[in-house]
């Protein structure tokens, strides 16, 4: 096995090991999420994406080269199998065909597991997020149920208290209503008396005003008569003199 195919085989074994580790049931997705959240992965994210695409391209090239080798030695294997002149050449070709087929499987499975590994990491990350959201939603639902039960219990207590004190409250309300009605009647009576007194006072004021006007007229008349009498007396005195 050449150096390049030894590296591809080692890469394939590493992929298989990583996939088996990711599939271990006792390691939860949240643990993998914490590992994937390390700052180291954020720093090498750009390099990682470029390396991922580069490895895919290399594996595709090796896979196509292996396909070419398989097709090449398959045709040669068929020709030399029918020929009996060189038996060693047939075995040599068969060995090369076996190696090319081995390289085809190694490169093909390496490419396949590389894509599966990338997809598996993505699914584990998504599953960890969904489980975290599920835990948060479960906690919120439990808190909501507890709050609802608490409110229902308080509501039942209030209903029982209202039922026990309902009769007393009705009696108190009736007494208050009766008192309000009596106060209303008293206010109406006082208002009526006040209105009558106000009307009477207005009438008295009008009468006093009329009397004052009559007295003013009589006073004016008396003043006029008094002045006339004085004039007469003055004339009589002048005649006597």
UniProtKB/Swiss-Prot annotation:
Disulfide pattern: none
Residue ranges spanning the membrane: these are: 7-27, 44-64, 104-124
Q: In what way does this protein cross or attach to the membrane?
A: Multi-pass membrane protein
List the keywords (alphabetical). Answer: Apoptosis, Coiled coil, Endoplasmic reticulum, ER-Golgi transport, Membrane, Protein transport, Transmembrane, Transmembrane helix, Transport
Q: List this protein's GO terms for biological process.
A: apoptotic process; endoplasmic reticulum to Golgi vesicle-mediated transport; intracellular protein transport; osteoblast differentiation; protein localization to endoplasmic reticulum exit site
Q: What Pfam families does the entry give?
A: Bap31, Bap31_Bap29_C
User: Main localization of the protein?
Assistant: endoplasmic reticulum
Residue spans of biased composition, Basic and acidic residues class: 206-223
> Topological domain, Cytoplasmic: which ranges?
28-43, 125-241
Lumenal topological domain ranges are 1-6, 65-103
Disordered, as annotated region: 198-223
Q: Where in the cell is it found?
A: Endoplasmic reticulum membrane
- Entry coiled-coil feature ranges: 166-233
GO cellular component terms, alphabetically, are: endoplasmic reticulum membrane; membrane
Give start-end ranges for motif Di-lysine motif: 238-241
The UniProt entry's sequence similarity note says: Belongs to the BCAP29/BCAP31 family.
Q: How does it assemble?
A: Homodimer. Heterodimer with BCAP31. Binds CASP8 (isoform 9) as a complex containing BCAP31, BCAP29, BCL2 and/or BCL2L1. Interacts with VAMP3, VAMP1 and membrane IgD immunoglobulins. May interact with ACTG1 and non-muscle myosin II.
Role according to the record: May play a role in anterograde transport of membrane proteins from the endoplasmic reticulum to the Golgi. May be involved in CASP8-mediated apoptosis.
Q: What is this protein called?
A: B-cell receptor-associated protein 29
Task: List the top taxonomic levels of the source.
Answer: Eukaryota, Metazoa, Chordata, Craniata, Vertebrata
């Amino acid at each position: 096995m050449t150096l390049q195919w030894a590296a591809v085989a080692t890469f394939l074994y590493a992929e298989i090991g990583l996939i088996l580790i990711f599939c271990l049931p006792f390691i939860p997705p949240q643990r993998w999420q914490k590992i994937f959240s390390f700052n180291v992965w954020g720093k090498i994210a750009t390099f990682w994406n470029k390396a991922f695409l580069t490895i895919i391209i290399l594996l595709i090239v090796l896979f196509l080269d292996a396909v070419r080798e398989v097709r090449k030695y398959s045709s040669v294997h068929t020709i030399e199998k029918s020929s009996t002149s060189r038996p060693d050449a047939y075995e040599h070709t068969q060995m090369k065909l076996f190696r090319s087929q081995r390289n085809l499987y190694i490169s093909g499975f390496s490419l396949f597991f590389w894509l599966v590994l990338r997809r598996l990491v993505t699914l584990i990350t998504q599953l960890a997020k969904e489980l975290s959201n599920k835990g948060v939603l479960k906690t919120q639902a439990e808190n909501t149920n507890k709050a609802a039960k608490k409110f229902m219990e308080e509501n039942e207590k209030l209903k029982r208290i209202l039922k026990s004190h309902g009769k007393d409250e009705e009696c108190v309300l009736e007494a208050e209503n009766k008192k309000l009605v009596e106060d209303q009647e008293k206010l109406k009576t006082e208002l009526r008396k006040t209105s009558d007194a106000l009307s009477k006072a207005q009438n008295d004021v009008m009468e006093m005003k009329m009397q004052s006007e009559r007295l003013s007229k009589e006073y004016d008349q008396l003043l006029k008569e008094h002045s006339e009498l004085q004039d007469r007396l003055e004339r009589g005195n002048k005649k006597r003199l």
